[in-house]
Amino acid sequence: MKKEMIVYSVSDSLGGTSQKLLSAVTAQYPDIIFNNSYRFPFINKEEELLDILRDAIKDDALVISTLVDGKLASVAREFSQAHGLSYLDLMHPFFEIIKEKTGTDPIEVPGTLHRLDSEYFNKISAIEFAVKYDDGKAPQGFLDSDIVLLGVSRTSKTPLSIYLANKGYKVSNLPLIPEVPLPQVLEKVDSRRLIGLVCEPEKLAKIRSHRLDSLGLTQETSYTDLEKIYQELDYSKTVFKKYGAQIINMSDKSIEETAFLIEEHLKKLN
């Protein structure tokens, strides 16, 4: 039977930082169930914070804090030490190191990571762009794209487009289907901005089969036929070569890893 650990996440903002760290840590413990349903964002009152910490003691929970307010963080730390509560402060030890190195204090303003600045609105615009020019719906958008993703069905074009859009990049994508002519505008796109996505045929067949299963479609079709998939991938590689696209094999890469490679590629263009 797997062990279970209850985790409280406390923040004076959204608390996204602790969630990202927790996801990375929990992945290293497949035999432990982490109950992370106890999330407490926008905490700004001392008594409210203490009530949460008292409940954490009752649940024998681990408390992860991203409180930036120095007074609240001190209250939480002192309470936890006095009551033997497992408490992890993700912010203030980092602040102390920076102050030691630079002599500079943090501004201690919650939510500055999520402020509505030009970067935020650029990201929203990029997401709208990715949706508008998804799946080759409007090929003229290729000319305004930071990146154009090319690939056969189920090579992660759409999720990769949205992921990169969340980083502010304008991304469009085009599904490659041997029977469907390529849009002429593709010839006008800077080849350095073309990324061709491929996947090992056997893995792609499994991904497609899983997709059909999720839709309640179990009948064998050419969509999952291995020979047909080989033909599609051969066709896609011909297209990549013709237009000078950089090729990335998605077989053993996550969306995040692939996005990193694309970002590194983009940096070389600027």
Curated annotation (Swiss-Prot):
It comes from the Bacteria. Pfam families: Kinase-PPPase. InterPro entries: Kinase-pyrophosphorylase, PPDK_reg. It catalyses: N(tele)-phospho-L-histidyl/L-threonyl-[pyruvate, phosphate dikinase] + ADP = N(tele)-phospho-L-histidyl/O-phospho-L-threonyl-[pyruvate, phosphate dikinase] + AMP + H(+); N(tele)-phospho-L-histidyl/O-phospho-L-threonyl-[pyruvate, phosphate dikinase] + phosphate + H(+) = N(tele)-phospho-L-histidyl/L-threonyl-[pyruvate, phosphate dikinase] + diphosphate. Its EC number is 2.7.11.32, 2.7.4.27. ADP binds at residues 151-158. GO terms for molecular function: ADP binding; ATP binding; phosphotransferase activity, phosphate group as acceptor; protein serine/threonine kinase activity. Belongs to the pyruvate, phosphate/water dikinase regulatory protein family. PDRP subfamily. Bifunctional serine/threonine kinase and phosphorylase involved in the regulation of the pyruvate, phosphate dikinase (PPDK) by catalyzing its phosphorylation/dephosphorylation. PANTHER family: PYRUVATE, PHOSPHATE DIKINASE REGULATORY PROTEIN 1, CHLOROPLASTIC. This is Putative pyruvate, phosphate dikinase regulatory protein. It comes from Streptococcus gordonii (strain Challis / ATCC 35105 / BCRC 15272 / CH1 / DL1 / V288).
